[in-house]
């Protein structure tokens, strides 16, 4: 998997930055922005097993960078023939004091030592960016992140040129236009992968309609 250092090199090459006009901090910030956009379109899916330490409807999770839960099983027992038989939808997820917190409104209240299994969408990461220890980006999506980050970096630099003396006529507008085009191509790609993503956002359970609505 590609590390931050490799991404920096590729972004600089895309910018044809032979004179080091783009600082590492600018490139990292540009990459950070496109990574966040990429996550919204194509999150990284992970699993987490939460052992209940205190019985109750409210359970605080330690799962990092949790965006949305796509599957929850309680009680979870991996020794069963079908450990996912007790899948639940009678819960809400909210952030309380910065921590993902579950609230179960059904009749089955989690008890001490029971296990809650969750599958969830999480933030995508790149090794060494913001201390991440793994790169989760698909290899075939790397090119488009480089394209988007190069576009972001160009627009950031163009904004700075507006405050500088001695710039060449038209340099700022040309750079801004180029950067915007690259970033627009990146956003178009995100629309494509959103359509490919299989992210269940609707519950399987339904309410019966009233007799007069049938």
Enumerate the language-model features and the residues they cover.
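Glycine-enriched, solvent-exposed interface loops adjoining structured elements
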Residues: 1-214
């Amino acid at each position: 998997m590609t590390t931050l250092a490799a991404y920096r090199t590729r972004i600089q090459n895309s910018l044809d930055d032979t004179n080091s006009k783009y600082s590492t901090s600018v490139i990292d910030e540009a990459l950070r922005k496109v990574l966040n956009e990429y996550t919204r379109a194509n999150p990284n899916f992970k699993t987490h097993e939460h052992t209940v330490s205190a019985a109750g409807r409210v359970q605080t999770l330690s799962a990092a960078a949790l965006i949305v839960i796509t599957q929850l099983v309680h009680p979870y027992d991996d020794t069963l023939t079908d450990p996912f038989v007790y899948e639940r939808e009678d819960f809400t997820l909210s952030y309380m004091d910065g921590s993902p917190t579950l609230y179960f409104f059904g009749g089955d209240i989690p008890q001490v030592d029971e296990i809650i299994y969750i599958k969830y969408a999480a933030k995508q990461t790149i090794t060494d960016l913001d201390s991440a220890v793994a790169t989760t980006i698909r290899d075939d999506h790397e090119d488009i992140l480089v394209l988007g980050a190069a576009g972001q970096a160009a627009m950031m630099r163009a904004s700075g040129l507006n405050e500088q003396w001695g710039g060449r006529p038209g340099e700022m507008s040309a750079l801004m236009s180029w950067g915007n085009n690259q970033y627009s191509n990146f956003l178009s790609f995100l629309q494509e992968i959103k359509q490919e993503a299989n992210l269940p956002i609707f519950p399987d359970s339904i309410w019966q309609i009233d007799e007069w609505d049938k």
